[in-house]
């Protein structure tokens, strides 16, 4: 390790040289109160910015030990510090001048939810913050004077105001930690009370717009029906009341634009802790809850969908269904079975985004097309089996078919954004609208021993003078490229995650791409099953955190996904 003054001397020595001379700065430097690491230096002022990190020992940072004693509070503290750092950095980004990305100081921008990120990580010894800096240049000539401003004027201020307890509001930070502990208490309370979700009285469920996750202003606050209201005594906040959704089959109905999908959206994101002031802080859902929908054109590999689809006219095997281009019903059947394999205890569905022929067949259709001629067993006929025999609850938004009233344990009507428990009313009316015999074929648990087939790496090479392709002795290194939140490419394959709706952030997608790359290179051997591979990955994550994905150094830009999203990613990876 070198001193900060040695870094200053290095900056002076490379000033006005060609841009690649910046590479000599790579290393670690002791500053007052923290260690600065230059982990990766960009090759060009127009290229992706350089990777920087700072490390502060707990002795220097001064945070109470109870604020990093377990993973929950450590992740919460790290999220809070990242937000503070981003506020400070925004005052200085591009204050240093130059061409291209010169002067950029970039920190992860956190949303309304709390995620474990590499942007800030806290161990028992220290706090590490990671970010990006665009090293300044005039054209492609080094402007080290401007970089000196960043390292010796701007960053010390940002670090001092963001990562030292003495400069932060102790009361505000305490509230942040207490909120996380209260949220975790509710999550555990759901299990104890056989609930799958909780929505507090006073919650603000609508969002500002379709492209914003911030709460809407001047909207109707949530108020639970008396029959579903539960009370909890939280460790810090004290008594809280709200709607408890019991395990089983819950139907959410109501007129168009009355708030059905808004409630479902809040529940699907209730798997994450939300920040104070979000309006959904105390909207908590079973951590394994999975939103499912139809996905026309989806890739499916060796999935046992016989629980829902059987006796195809072409005699195609549905016990090991594979297709490059699934229909809506096939994709939704596969999604449910894959969700079961991933350990989901709650399925969230919206009639609007489901395949109609997969969800329900009305009485008239059953009379015209007999069961013997219909290979699809609709979800209507399987939902009770899923709960009674597999312990999987369903929360379903419906607006057109009344058939679901017959199987629902709880019916919630959204009326002008206010929930009303109409279970008794709906059940009383069911007698007047009987269903035809809807007994499904006997339930059997889907097989879940799918072997992940090994994908041969692409051979690198080039054409010779005569146009003949000459392969390299070693195959090309597998490369990944992120396409925002909605997917990535790995090698020559695209992994489409557009309809994995509980993914929040491109940093989670970045992690998924790295996990899949690691698995393809080191775990997928044609012998291991998908659950075995995912378990091996999570054992590594538990022991080493996201650091094991690093290739030489850990960078900013990774966030932890759930197992459900890891399964969803691997299942969408096209392979032989």
Task: List each model region and its residues.
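Phosphate-binding/switch loop-helix module in NTP-utilizing enzymes
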Residues: 320-354
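Flexible beta-alpha connector loops of hexameric P-loop NTPases
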Residues: 143, 298, 308-329, 361-376
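Carboxylate/His-rich catalytic cores and anion/metal-binding grooves
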Residues: 191-195, 201, 257, 264-295, ...
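N-terminal pre-Walker A segment at the start of P-loop NTPase domains
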Residues: 206-241, 276, 284-289, 293-300, ...
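Conserved P-loop NTPase nucleotide-binding/switch module
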Residues: 340-383, 387-388, 400-428
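N-terminal accessory targeting/assembly segments
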Residues: 1-185, 190-194, 205
């Amino acid at each position: 390790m070198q001193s900060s003054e040695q870094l200053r001397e290095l900056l002076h020595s490379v000033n006005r040289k060609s841009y690649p001379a910046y590479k000599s700065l790579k290393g670690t430097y002791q500053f007052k109160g923290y260690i600065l690491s230059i982990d990766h230096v960009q090759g060009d002022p127009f290229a992706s910015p350089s990777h920087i990190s700072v490390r502060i020992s707990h002795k220097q940072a001064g945070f109470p030990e109870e604020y990093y004693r377990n993973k929950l509070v450590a992740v919460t503290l790290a999220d809070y510090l990242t937000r503070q750092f981003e506020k400070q950095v925004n005052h200085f980004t591009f204050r240093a001048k130059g061409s291209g990305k010169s002067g950029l100081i970039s920190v992860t921008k956190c949303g309304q939810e709390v995620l474990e990120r590499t942007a800030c990580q806290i161990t028992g010894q220290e706090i590490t913050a990671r970010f990006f800096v665009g090293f300044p240049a005039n054209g492609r000539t080094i402007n080290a004077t401007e970089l000196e401003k960043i390292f010796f004027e701007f960053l010390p201020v940002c670090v001092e105001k963001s990562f030292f307890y003495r400069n932060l509001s102790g009361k505000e930070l305490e509230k942040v930690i207490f909120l996380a502990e209260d949220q975790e208490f509710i999550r555990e309370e759901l299990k104890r009370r056989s609930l799958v979700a909780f929505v507090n009285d006073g919650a603000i469920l609508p969002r500002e717009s379709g492209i914003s996750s911030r709460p809407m202003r001047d909207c109707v606050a949530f108020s639970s029906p008396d029959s579903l209201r539960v009370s909890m005594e939280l460790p810090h906040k004290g008594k809280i009341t709200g709607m408890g959704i019991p395990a089983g089959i819950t139907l959410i109905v109501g007129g168009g634009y009355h708030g059905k999908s808004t409630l479902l959206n809040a529940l699907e994101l209730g798997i994450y802790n939300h920040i104070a002031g979000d309006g959904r802080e105390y909207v908590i859902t079973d951590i394994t809850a999975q939103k499912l929908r139809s996905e026309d054109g989806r890739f499916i590999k060796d999935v046992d969908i016989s629980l829902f689809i059987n006796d195809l006219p072409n005699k195609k095997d549905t016990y090991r269904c594979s297709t490059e281009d699934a229909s809506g019903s096939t994709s939704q059947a596969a999604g449910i079975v894959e969700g079961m394999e991933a350990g989901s205890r709650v399925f969230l569905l919206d009639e609007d985004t489901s395949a109609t022929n997969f969800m329900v067949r009305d009485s008239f259709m059953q009379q015209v097309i007999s069961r013997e001629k219909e290979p699809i067993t609709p979800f209507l006929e399987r939902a009770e089996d899923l709960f009674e025999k597999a312990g999987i609850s369903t929360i379903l938004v419906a607006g057109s078919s009344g058939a679901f009233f017959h199987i629902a344990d709880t019916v919630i009507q959204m009326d002008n954004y206010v929930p009303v428990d109409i279970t008794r009313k709906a059940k009383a009316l069911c007698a007047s609208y009987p269903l035809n015999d809807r007994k499904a074929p006997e339930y059997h648990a889907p097989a879940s021993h799918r072997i992940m087939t090994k994908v041969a790496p692409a051979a690198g090479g080039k054409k010779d003078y005569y146009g003949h392709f000459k392969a390299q002795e070693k195959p090309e290194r597998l490369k990944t490229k992120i396409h925002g939140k909605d997917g990535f490419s790995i090698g020559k394959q695209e992994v489409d995650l557009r309809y994995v709706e509980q993914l929040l952030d491109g940093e989670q997608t970045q992690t998924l791409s790295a996990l899949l790359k690691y698995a393809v290179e080191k775990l997928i051997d044609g012998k291991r099953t998908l659950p075995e591979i995912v378990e091996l990955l999570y054992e590594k994550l538990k022991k080493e955190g996201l650091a094991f994905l690093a290739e030489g150094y850990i960078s900013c830009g990774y966030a932890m996904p759930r197992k459900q999203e890891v399964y969803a990613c691997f299942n969408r990876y096209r392979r032989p």
